[in-house]
Structures are given as structure tokens and as C-alpha cells.
Amino acid sequence: MEIELKNVNYFRDGKYILKNVYFKFEKNGIYTVVGPSGAGKSTMLKLINRLIEPTEGAIFINGVEYKNIDVILLRRKIGMVFQRPFLFEGTVKENIELGPSLRGEKNIDALFYLEAVGLSKDYLFKDVNNLSGGEAQRVSIARALANSPEVLLLDEPTSSLDPTSTSIIEELIKRLNREGIMVILVTHNMEQAKRIGDYTLFLYKGELIEARKTWEFFENPVSEVSKLFLEGKLKEMIK
């Protein structure tokens, strides 16, 4: 799948959250989106998933402006997992089956998707309120996978997890990508971006400053703003 942001602006509360962003996600891989808080990273994901609409500019999916694509179909093909796992009251099985069942599908193999994220059949009938943070996040990913997405948008999925759970989620992300799912991951963790990113986008004050292969961005940043950010000195510049 190709996702193209063409001169996208998003204006809210009297200011631009994203400014004139142009980028095409066209190669299967793991794209990490980094930048300081308030740079527009999460907004970019919400725009791609059509939770919000661009103020100006347009977004294209495989060459078709996404306003011309049924929003339900769009969200089946582009799954999104949030920073805090959002699960509905009920069992793990009911959560995984939710999307397909709303479309009238029957005989959904919830166990298949549960095992795809490394959880056993013992979890199927667990109440979601009894899951750990890492388990809940994996169930969120399993629910997204049940829609057979081509792209996964992940908004800081490990920010509140312990190192062991973080490692499990990172390995899962890499495996899903190897299986053909494009991943766009927002993270504040630069080490995580280095570990799993193929490409890195750096946003600052709503502008896309750099978009390069991850190793190139970290080893040889082009922009002075990028250098300050990687050196942890960007706060001084903001002041």
C-alpha cells in the first residue's frame, strides 16, 4: 500500500499542528516518527486513519484521495493502536471478534490472532480488566489484525510498558512487518527507533524536517534542528 500526504496542513485552536507536510509511505518497512512533544506526530497518525480531516492538502491511498474511499474499508486496511490500550468491556475473544462480527462475519478464529501476538488460548475468555498493560496492548494489536490490515499505525504502544513487555511488542512489530504489514510507529524512545526503524521521519513544530533511512538520520542528521534534537539540546532552542 502507498500512503501519500500531499501538502497536508492541520489547523486547530488558532495554530497549525501540521504544516505543509509532504511524504509518501511507499515501501514496506517500519517507519518511526520522532520529534518533541507537540510536534504533530500523533496528529499525523490520526489524519492517516481519518479520525480527523486535513484543513488543507490531501491524503491519497494507492493514488486515490482517501475522501473517496469508504471510511470503514479504510480503517480495515489501516489499523491503529493507541498509546493506552482501548478495549471494550468483556472477554479477550469478544474484543478480537468485534470488527469482523460487526461486518456480519461468522466463525472468526480469534485464537489465530491471539496466537499471532504471542498469547495462548488460556487468554481467550479472560476479562480484559484482568490483563497486564503488555497483555492488553497485544490484545489491541490482535484486534487490529483481525481486520487483515495492510498498514498498522502505532502511537507510542510501549511508552507505559516495562522493558520485558516492550521487547515482546518490538519483536512482534518486526515479525508483522516481515509478514508484509507496513508499520508506522510514533515513539519518544530514540533507542527504540534505532532498534526497529527502517526509515525515520523527524517532525518539529508541525513541519517534516527530515525523512531518511533510520541509520542515516541518527548517524548523519542534515538539519541543525535534527542535530540539536538528537543531542538533547532542542529545549534550549525552544526557549
Curated annotation (Swiss-Prot):
InterPro entries: AAA+_ATPase, ABC_transporter-like_ATP-bd, ABC_transporter-like_CS, P-loop_NTPase, PstB-like. It is a peripheral membrane protein. CDD domains: ABC_PstB_phosphate_transporter (cd03260). GO terms for biological process: phosphate ion transmembrane transport. Keywords: ATP-binding, Cell membrane, Membrane, Nucleotide-binding, Phosphate transport, Translocase, Transport. One of its GO terms (cellular component) is plasma membrane. It is an enzyme of class 7 (translocase). Its EC number is 7.3.2.1. GO terms for molecular function: ATP binding; ATP hydrolysis activity; ATPase-coupled phosphate ion transmembrane transporter activity. ATP binds at residues 35-42. It comes from the Bacteria. Its main location: membrane. It is found in: Cell membrane. Pfam families: ABC_tran. SMART domains: AAA (SM00382). Gene3D superfamilies: P-loop containing nucleotide triphosphate hydrolases. Residues 3-230 form the ABC transporter domain. Belongs to the ABC transporter superfamily. Phosphate importer (TC 3.A.1.7) family. Part of the ABC transporter complex PstSACB involved in phosphate import. Responsible for energy coupling to the transport system. The complex is composed of two ATP-binding proteins (PstB), two transmembrane proteins (PstC and PstA) and a solute-binding protein (PstS). This is Phosphate import ATP-binding protein PstB 1. It comes from Caldanaerobacter subterraneus subsp. tengcongensis (strain DSM 15242 / JCM 11007 / NBRC 100824 / MB4) (Thermoanaerobacter tengcongensis).
